[in-house]
């Protein structure tokens, strides 16, 4: 493991290394990316996104976390309905817990990619007590930080950034907040984002014409915005409770109801041409290893849930939440699919999601939506599709040593064949060796499935055995 600053050049260098190593080994690769920000055009057109996307075009698979700002209003947008119309953006000066922001960071982008200036933009200090705007001088804003306007050459969009030191701007007066006045002509429109930790958009009581803050269009820049990257959101796979190792008490870290999209999970849509998020996976209150060498690690942290001693060293586990917990679930699942079919492309993966992702009442039944993309990942159903997505000629290979896959459900075993087989002999035995069930299948095709029902068996321990020409698999089965 090596440290990383996650700067663009460094991420590109590491991706290049992994790509070249995989090519040298003659193997596919999948990269997990759990980082990002709200700074950027969110259209996948930055030079960095284009360079990373080239690896996807060459067959590399990138899996990226959407981000954890779904419960914040980091985005706003506006379309002007008449010429010389003015709209104001207001940025909160404190977090929900009352802690003041140290800085404000706003990134604003025209939707038109025509290389022209459409807006007149002026920063101001707004007094929430007397409802007055103070535009200040250029020298004042230079002391506060930086305000930059440009036409970005890589996407030809008008672009403004504001990076403001909060304490310099307001002098410690909590009544003073940062604002931006935007004037445009009919039909022009923009999107703007506050970077996480750099404020939220809102409308102060009694303030003049204000753009409404929301949580949409928040596909994380730097990873999830890469056009062919698989952007991952989080849903709640449990009820949010856990028992602490520290005091054996039950705690709740709920991110919403079980089965729903986690309230922290960033949502789309994406301003480029892709479905983002593309898929969601469990990411709320997930048990994982804790780094005891981290500066903020504490043995008294109630989120710790288990420890294991190996020699003289103690290893700790605890619960964490975030799309960075959901993303490795997807990355690992795709790695499993690549074992079954190393030729899968990023587009193949998307098609598998489209065909197999689960939809339910908690997240809706439409083909896609801005919160969960195609739906909840189904590793097993996706594996079946991955096996079926084989190149012409594979179907002529019989009796491979590719292992079968077994999925245990409440009252049955589902057996998935990873290769063509001339036959399969399936039998279930008691621990004393008495055969209680048997099946025989011929001319099995890659991706075929057999189901063994256990519903008629008495409670106890059984052994299931599957024989093919080149492979024999045995598993214990507990029937309750």
Name these PLM-found stretches:
Residues 397-480:
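C-terminal outer-membrane/trafficking sorting elements
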Residues 28-37, 41-44, 55, 59-66, ...:
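C-terminal subdomain of the subtilisin-like protease fold in secreted/lumenal serine endopeptidases
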Residues 1-8, 12, 16-24, 105-113, ...:
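Hydrolase catalytic cores
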Residues 3, 19-42, 65, 181-185, ...:
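Short acidic, glycine-rich surface-loop motifs adjacent to enzyme active sites
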Residues 23-25, 55-57, 222-227, 270-274, ...:
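Extracellular/periplasmic catalytic domains that process cell-envelope and extracellular macromolecules
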Residues 37-60, 64-260, 288-323:
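Substrate-binding/specificity loop regions of serine endopeptidase catalytic domains
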Residues 112-116, 283, 419-423:
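Short proline/glycine-enriched turn/loop motifs at strand-loop junctions of beta-rich domains
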